[in-house]
Amino acid sequence: MSIFRRRGRDEREPAEAPSAADTSEPTGDSGGTDKDPRSSGPYDSSEIDLEQSRADRIDLGGLLIRRVEGLQLQLQVDEKSGRPAGVMVVLDDAAVQMIPVAAPRSSGLWDQTRLQIAADAQRLGGTAEEAAGPFGTEVRIVLPVTTPEGKKAVQPSRVAGIDGPRWMLRTTFLGAAVTSPEAFGRLVQVVRDTVVVRGDSPMPPGELIALRPPQKPEAPEA
């Protein structure tokens, strides 16, 4: 039901450069913002029955992701530290990357993080604009890239950060999730059903919340 494997970060193939009749802009999206974008998830581990959530979800340590038919998980490892740095959730041709990080107790991180994301995109020759999305203000990005075959291409994405209690979950929607409202909606629900397990240890803002491969089910006793 789920396929789990390790990959490097941002290892999704870009789309080929569109013709003049095509658009490279992300589509608009399934729903605007609520007064509380997190009222329907993702959840903090203190807000739910943690034991039941672990039974219903794939346990990656810092993230619990609900099982969905056809869902694939690709653990992404930071090349410098060798530690898991995020997870790519793939459904058909759509994907969402999720990266959980620690945040201050008194304030969230997304307001300042999205400014840096937009600046980085523009520095790389791409475009970035803010828009309303299901998790609040998001950043819609289009980056110029080169395929392994040497062709010019673009990679559109939608980046949303969700501030929780002492954590932020950064989500980047890719592939069909950018161009198909239906595919986007399916992955939005995956994000909403996710549980963040930060832990109680002190952590500086921006530090990655530890992830790990899922544990194999224990063999039943004879």
What are these language model-derived features?
Residues 7-45:
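N-terminal intrinsically disordered, low-complexity tails
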Residues 4, 32-60, 66-68, 72-155, ...:
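Conserved polar/disulfide-associated segments of primarily extracytoplasmic proteins
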Residues 71, 172-221:
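Surface-exposed amphipathic alpha-helical segments
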Residues 1-2, 8, 15-16, 24, ...:
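Long, low-complexity intrinsically disordered regions
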Residues 20, 90, 129-132, 136, ...:
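A sequence-level detector of short, solvent-exposed, charge-rich linear segments
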Residues 156-161:
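Hydrophobic/aromatic beta-strand elements that line small-molecule binding cavities or substrate pockets
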